[in-house]
């Protein structure tokens, strides 16, 4: 997936916007912006006695993309002392849906669309390569399902039903 540089940041307002494929470039930029804002909050927290961290607002309008890049941003959000609120402004699909779920608080608009689906990939290679790829896909799929169950009211049965469609 190629990034079209549709990720925006207004660090003065602590507002970020993901309107691109979830890939190394777009997630790298967002992660950097978030980490910078967290660092600034950490410094203020040390200097000011009653410093109150204002939330970072992450607006999402993305079809998704790379599951590996997705996890990098999710871990930063989940481990942030600064609250990060996610907003779906149109659609949060696939990897973008899981990023949305990471928000400390989550908001969506009336016409927002979400999509969760089973993982897909295209592989070729020698037999052993394919066996190892299958094991990796099984592990990633399990990790994804557990995360969605943990962050939503969906049950394992709900996830299984979605996956079988």
Regions found by a protein language model. Give the residues of each.
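Terminal-region recognition feature
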Residues: 1-165
């Amino acid at each position: 997936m190629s990034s079209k540089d549709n990720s925006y940041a207004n660090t003065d307002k602590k507002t970020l916007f993901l309107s691109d494929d979830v890939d190394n470039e777009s997630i790298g930029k967002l992660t950097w912006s978030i980490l910078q804002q967290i660092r600034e909050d950490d410094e203020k927290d040390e200097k000011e006695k009653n410093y109150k961290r204002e939330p970072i607002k992450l607006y999402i309008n993305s079809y998704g993309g790379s599951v590996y890049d997705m996890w990098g941003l999710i871990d930063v959000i989940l481990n942030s002392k600064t609250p990060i609120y996610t907003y779906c402004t149109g659609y949060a699909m696939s990897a973008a849906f899981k990023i949305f779920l990471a928000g400390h608080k989550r908001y969506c608009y009336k016409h927002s669309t979400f999509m969760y689906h089973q993982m897909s990939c295209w592989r070729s290679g020698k037999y052993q390569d394919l066996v190892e790829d299958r094991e990796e896909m099984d592990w990633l799929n399990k990790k994804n399902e557990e995360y969605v169950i943990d962050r939503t009211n969906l049950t394992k049965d709900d996830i299984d039903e979605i996956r079988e469609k």
